[in-house]
């Protein structure tokens, strides 16, 4: 008798053919997957390189910005000092003057004061002289309150000028303020 039952562990010819076809179909799929993987790895390497370049460029920009700020501070002080040199020259000339002419010395001091004021203004240092203005605790320091005809809390007199630099108070003005009636 002939055995018509097939052994389940032995592949049939049909199974072998389908496995060959599957293997042949899998080969291009594997090649495609390998190609896609290689392409993805190349893209990752490219992006990593781009990231490192961008990071280095950002660091360079940050360093250049710090250098620029440092130079700006240095040269701002240099410019301010240059504006003060004529004041120094005038004071030295006054000290060396032996004429004894009080009017001439006073004229020289007034000129020196104008030079100093000009130098400070070029450095954006501006005097606060608030007579008649409403008292502002950010710009004024009240020394006393006095009875006055002016509106209450108005600056009556300035004992010492205050100064600002670029809208920032260097020194508040020392003032006397009108007392409420």
Curated annotation (Swiss-Prot):
Subunit structure: Homodimer.
GO cellular component: cytosol
Span list, region Disordered: 1-33
Protein name stated in the entry: Protein GrpE
Family membership noted in the UniProt record: Belongs to the GrpE family.
Entry's localization field: Cytoplasm
Annotated keywords: Chaperone, Cytoplasm, Stress response
Role: Participates actively in the response to hyperosmotic and heat shock by preventing the aggregation of stress-denatured proteins, in association with DnaK and GrpE. It is the nucleotide exchange factor for DnaK and may function as a thermosensor. Unfolded proteins bind initially to DnaJ; upon interaction with the DnaJ-bound protein, DnaK hydrolyzes its bound ATP, resulting in the formation of a stable complex. GrpE releases ADP from DnaK; ATP binding to DnaK triggers the release of the substrate protein, thus completing the reaction cycle.
Keyword flag Cytoplasm: yes
One GO term of the biological process aspect: protein folding
InterPro entries per record: GrpE, GrpE_coiled_coil, GrpE_head
Organism: Burkholderia cenocepacia (strain HI2424)
Compositionally skewed regions (Low complexity) per UniProt: 21-33
GO molecular function: adenyl-nucleotide exchange factor activity; protein homodimerization activity; protein-folding chaperone binding; unfolded protein binding
Biased composition (Polar residues): 1-12
């Amino acid at each position: 008798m002939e055995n018509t039952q097939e052994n389940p562990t032995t592949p049939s010819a049909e199974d072998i053919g389908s496995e060959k076809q599957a293997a042949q179909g899998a080969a291009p799929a594997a090649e495609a997957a390998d190609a896609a993987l290689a392409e993805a790895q190349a893209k990752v390497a490219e992006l990593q390189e781009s990231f490192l370049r961008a990071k280095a460029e950002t660091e360079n920009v940050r360093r250049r910005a710090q250098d620029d700020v440092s130079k700006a501070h240095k040269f701002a002080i240099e410019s301010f000092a240059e504006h003060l040199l004529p004041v120094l020259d005038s004071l030295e000339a006054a000290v060396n003057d032996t004429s004894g002419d009080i009017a001439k010395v006073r004229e020289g001091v007034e000129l020196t004061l104008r030079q100093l004021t000009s130098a400070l203004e070029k450095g954006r240092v501006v005097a606060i002289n608030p007579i008649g203005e409403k008292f502002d605790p950010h710009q004024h320091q009240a020394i006393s309150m006095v009875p006055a005809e002016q509106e209450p809390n108005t600056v009556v007199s300035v004992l010492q000028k205050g100064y600002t630099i670029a809208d920032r108070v260097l020194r508040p003005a020392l003032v006397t303020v009108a007392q409420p009636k």
